[in-house]
């Protein structure tokens, strides 16, 4: 974004410990709460923001994440680093919804963000704010998409980036981060192990740790999902939100957004039921929810091909669980085989090439419908958090190579009539 030294309309007032409640100066570069090591959350002068954030004013602004500048932390326009993130479409997947028995299903297509996933939102705001406060080297652990987004926005801001990924992170994500100029370190371990190395890098090199909920501002970018959802539904929130959950920043951010929108008078008190979906091979939030725990114990031997939700331990676990419970929602684990099946099924029913994480969320819907967690006529918003081509490639037969001899082509054409139609049955 072409900028100047002109100030934004940000109404940022202070940072607050998510558990301690202690307030901190927001104009110093901070990570977690010094009191307890938990997440810091940005707080705004909402009474002042109410004067300028009216429905009419919002509608008149340029589409995109930064139209919500009163409720974002960046102080100067020259500090904003943007690649055009936000303003993603809310799509009604008619054929898929019909097959799943849901007449009010909508998919928020975050895969159209500039780095191919919802991670662009968080990194756009967090990188902008970190650089504004003096950071010149950023480091983060990543299962894939966050690393690519950090690398892209760091490059746009002109600062260094280091990304620590599990060695089995999807190749597309490794290539994206490296191509954008980040130093990519592949670690023989899980995302939690990558987080430990990233923290050590920050400690020894002076880099700023951008890990999920270990700094205050990625959640501020992610909360724009909630702002847009309210606007997409004409300021009457859907009945339920279904979200593939690893670190949980999106859920935490949306819940924060709904609180802020209500304080501004833009929505009422009604909230969607929030549902976290995880793979059954890595479901710490599901287990903690079912056990009634405030925190989630680390999940041992985490296994799932959906790299973005292979998070054995989330720093924001208490925030995620609080959101689920306060909303009357829940947490669902789906079998790995159903994730793979749903990715293919959804694509063949016209929903596009969705990520494995998004496919996990879709795979939960038949179970939720059967158990009465959602109704066939309810408005359900599901988040497509990333593009399918950035996930681990599915196991599929390579199409046969056809001879370039025109004499063989009639047989090829005739074989098209023998092609099997995909089985339209639900995968669960």
Please provide the spans of the model-predicted regions.
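PLP-dependent amino-acid enzyme catalytic core
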Residues: 1-428
